[in-house]
Amino acid sequence: YDEALEVLSNPDIADETVSAKINEITSIKASLVNYEGDIKHIFFHSLIVFPEMIFKDKTTPMGGYNAGFSEKAEFEKMLPQLYERGYVLYDLNECYEKVNGIMTRKEILLPPGKQPLILSVDDVAYAYGNGYAQKLMVNDDGILVNLVKNPSGEIVEMIDGDVFGVLDLFVQEHPDFSYKGHKGTLALTGYQGAFGFSLDTEEGQAEIIKTADALRAQGWNFASHSYTHNSKNFFGANSNPANIQYDTNKWIEKVAPYIGQTRLFIAPFGYRVKQPGLQYILDAGFEIYCTVSHEIINELYDDYALMSRIEIGGYSMTYYTKLLNENFFNVDEVFDADSRPPVI
């Protein structure tokens, strides 16, 4: 609102219409209230576009994609319900700031009845692409699209081939679902490239930069999801400070040059790195640390903020229906059990 008022205050454009708009915006701004409740954060993996390509056997219980992924059709059913419940897509960066070196929660000023929703998407490497997108790129017409193999084996361009395009189309119809045009956060790894492109070739790097710029223009920002995404020796029981330092430096060296610096760290597997390894992450400039939980957690420490994320996929829609029903959407109206095998 402040930015709009600043633009409209230019005497060169002053007239009755502009004056009325200034009064309207001033009135709206005065009505905003500080949201003081829990900040909720949901996350997705790539959307399953063609479930029939992944779930060929619907009788044998299955984890993997079935557990951790949502289908495109399911995501499209979630959005109207999130909107109707008063959620507003909010920038994770706008939730916290350091004041005199101490991490604090910022005021979150929203219209009455609205609450912030943080949305993030993990990985986006598109390493396999069977039933979901293979690439995210800017096409020859300058449009951000996914390349998706359809059941006929054809590679087709889809504007709505993943979270980004589906969400963008929804926000175009419901602009008040987004605060200041923000959409969400992409949590990028590096070991498999980014957006379906290699980080090790000039051609791949150029495509990654173009895609990142297009995403940023659509209201997305970026987080480190670690470079290795490795639970064995890095983000798991065998984690050690030397490996955390290696992984952190590797992400900054290999990924950050093409998508930009960030202060957001979204831990792989939701693993909470302990000291002294955590210090390498904090010293690298990451100030907001996100885990995974089926509880809503917002915690402040002197030098960082901790926030839990709730995964939205087959597992949570099967085993955590109460949590999702109470907070986000009606699972029975969203979950497509007919297209999936039983979830384990």
Task: Please place each PLM-identified region on the residue numbering.
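C-terminal active-site subregion of NodB/CE4 polysaccharide deacetylases
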Residues: S31-L92, T104-L119, Y128-G131, A217, ...
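Beta-rich interaction/scaffold domains
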Residues: Y1-K29
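Structural detector of well-ordered beta-strand residues that form the stable sheet scaffold
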Residues: T185-A187, A223, Y289-C290
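Short, solvent-exposed turn/loop segments enriched in Gly/Ser/Thr/Pro and often Arg
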Residues: N93-N100, A187-G190, S226-T228, I266-Y271, ...
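Active-site beta->alpha N-cap acidic-glycine motif
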Residues: D38-A214, Q218
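Aromatic- and acid-rich polysaccharide-binding/catalytic face
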Residues: A212, R216-N230
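A short acidic, helix-capping loop that chelates divalent metal ions and anchors anionic groups
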Residues: F195-G196, S231-F235
